[in-house]
Amino acid sequence: MKKILTTPIKAEDLQDIHVGDVIYLTGTLVTCRDVCHRRLIELKRPLPYDLNGKAIFHAGPIVRKNGDKWEMVSVGPTTSMRMESFEREFIEQTGVKLVVGKGGMGPLTEEGCQKFKALHVIFPAGCAVLAATQVEEIEEVHWTELGMPESLWVCRVKEFGPLIVSIDTHGNNLIAENKKLFAERRDPIVEEICEHVHYIK
């Protein structure tokens, strides 16, 4: 059975979700990456859209005009770690509950998710066209002067995913934990290989 989060998301909706879980999103998803984060955190410019209880997507979409509406063509995830220095404050200031992106994030985001009850989730890379099919409608767009990839595209989505939980509200970080685990497994293997190839200069 699918675990589907629907916006507006509340803290209690997230308490039983853990790293490694696969979830889906229905409701509001707003594309929001580097420049929007900088505007809010560094320049202290308020966002033109209320993200409280909503979800953001680290993504630079391709959209096209269809009559008087915008249509999503492709929307693939951007590397989330680019937003690491801003994300904790961003979560605190906006009340956003779901941060969607590519790859993991670090200790600042981990702290923000635990303290302010949010999740970071990973959307599979290479599936930008699939993601676009899960966007039912682009409802609004803001900060268009930043260009298509950096604008805030307010999308209505249905069962958007799959989304793999990488940071949960309990302070667990799937990618960081996996790095430690893989390093522990790697070291004895490397030592064994070195014993067999020590003669190679």
Swiss-Prot record:
Keyword Iron in record: no
Factors inducing expression: Induced by tartrate, via TtdR.
Lineage: superkingdom: Bacteria
Keywords, in A-Z order: Lyase
Catalytic residue positions: H37
Record EC number: 4.2.1.32
GO MF annotation, one: L(+)-tartrate dehydratase activity
Chemical reaction(s) catalysed: (2R,3R)-tartrate = oxaloacetate + H2O
Keyword Cell cycle tagged: no
Subunit and partners: Heterotetramer of two alpha and two beta subunits.
Similarity annotation: Belongs to the class-I fumarase family.
Name assigned to this protein: L(+)-tartrate dehydratase subunit beta
Organism: Escherichia coli O157:H7
